[in-house]
């Protein structure tokens, strides 16, 4: 009997939500949100990150001023233990998700590599 791919995806979603790294990420995010200074700095970082991404997507040049501001924000971020923990935890979870994505994409990879042989 063939499994419904959407059911499997929902099961994966549930498994990720129950994952220890995700639970740590939730707790770290709550800690940042619960500290006004950390929350404001994190929001500033996210806005800066989004602005730079939009510039790049629109083909606009990232100026020296943009780079300088980004470096200043990152330096302040690195001084905030709550945000640093949040980002480290997010990075660990991203590695897990990247690994899962490689597993999911393996049939396509095998298909296309077999076509080239």
UniProtKB/Swiss-Prot annotation:
Pfam families: Com_YlbF. It comes from the Bacteria. This is UPF0342 protein BcerKBAB4_0767. Belongs to the UPF0342 family. HAMAP family: UPF0342.
């Amino acid at each position: 009997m063939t499994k419904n791919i959407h059911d499997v995806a929902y099961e994966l979603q549930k498994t990720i939500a129950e994952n220890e790294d995700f639970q740590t990420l939730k707790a770290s995010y709550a800690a940042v949100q619960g500290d006004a200074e950390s929350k404001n700095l994190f929001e500033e970082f996210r806005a800066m990150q989004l602005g730079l991404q939009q510039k790049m997507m629109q083909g606009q040049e990232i100026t020296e001023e943009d780079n300088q501001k980004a470096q200043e924000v990152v330096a302040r971020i690195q001084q905030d233990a709550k945000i640093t923990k949040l980002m480290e935890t997010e990075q660990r979870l991203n590695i897990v998700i990247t690994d899962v994505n490689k597993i999911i994409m393996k049939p396509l990879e095998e298909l296309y590599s077999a076509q080239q042989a």
